[in-house]
Amino acid sequence: MTKKYLFESIVKIRDFECDMQGVVNNAYYHNLLMQTRTEFLESIGIIRNEWSVERGIDFVVYETAIQYRSPIVAGETFRSCLNMHREGARYIYIQDFRRESGELCMRARVDVAVGLNGKLTRGEIFADYMKEHGVEFQEQPASRRTNSKIPNHIDDVIYDYEMKVRDYECDRYGSATNAFVQRYLEVTRLEFMEEMGETFRKWHENGVDMMVSKVDLKFIRPMMAAEKFHSLMNIRQDGPRVIFEQEIRRKNDMQLCVRASVEIVGIVDGELDTQGACFFHFINNQVPEWHSKNKM
């Protein structure tokens, strides 16, 4: 590959990391991305657990945008590549998954902040450490994300699904991992489809695969073990894409925990539906009809 990266590692996909189609589940990408960032930190002498316990320093994921390009299947080996720069108080990881041929399978932007004793900082601790250890990174002015598709709020919630955070879905701090947060969003979409009498398998049998092409997530508050929450959703079409606008709010006080935008494209008989025609009846007829009977 001609592109230079700050860090690379080799990853092999195992059967248990895949779904029924034998491809890596979209939510599991968060674990793979975290694994690479952790290995990068370890390569420069930072053990996350030790920094947290001994120094009170934690790395907090604030926002994630994942673009899925080509499915990764069971048994495949790929290169997990990482670059990083700084924008104000945030450290921006640009992460690529590439096959040995150089083909890009996935690209992610992960915004990370540095916390000290439970409070967010300007990130100087991390910057000073990297400079002392000869790690080169660019520093850029802080800027607002202009390409984020995450809505500020959902104008019209058409579906509300209640769930609960389980212990096994949490990290050592007792909060739901990013992978499980994305899984909650996926479960909500699946339950919504099933309530309308639709399933992704049914669409597949009719020659249409609904493929997630992009996920934007903003993590606002941690979701703690045993907490109940509402997973809220709206759906609309934008050209060839169906957009699921989603929020997660705590049940006890309706505080916002997560905002998300999930883009779906249609693959019809193996070809991308560039007009999104496969969704027209669903969006313009089925969804409004279901909504009129189930208004919240």
Question: Can you name each region flagged by the protein language model?
Answer:
Residues 1-69, 73-75, 194, 273-296:
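Hydrophobic, helix-prone linear segments
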Residues 7-9, 68-77, 81-151, 219, ...:
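HotDog/MaoC-like acyl-thioester-processing domains
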Residues 8, 61-63, 92, 160, ...:
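Short coil/loop residues immediately preceding or within conserved phosphate-binding loops
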Residues 55, 60-64, 76-80, 211-215, ...:
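A generic structural signal for short beta-strands and their flanking turns/coil linkers
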Residues 168-258:
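Structured core of small recognition/catalytic domains
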